[in-house]
């Protein structure tokens, strides 16, 4: 009786395992785009209290402007590129005390673990700020060959 396929040998299994293990860091290294991934999170969870409307703005903090993110404040710098644990934004969204955590616990919309990890990864990758797509100058694409 013929076997339709040969069982995986130890070396084939080892090669497959190594391939999977080596591909995981490559997936984690995917750059996080501020405009596509971070700004929508902020818009959904933060801009209500820290956005354009000065009458509703809390803490004198406006998160829709780049200047606010990178200049030192009395409490600390909102984002220290490459250092989430030194970034006030990250320490506030991961704070263990519910009274100090952002968004406040009474807000219906809370950050998900995936959103928190995206913010962490964005900071780790250098916190590259990209303007809203509507402010990016149009470029003519290259002609096809």
Task: State the predicted function of each range.
Residues 25-145:
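Aromatic- and Gly/Pro-enriched helix-to-coil junctions and flexible linker segments
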Residues 1-12, 92:
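Low-complexity proline/serine/threonine-rich segments in eukaryotic and viral proteins
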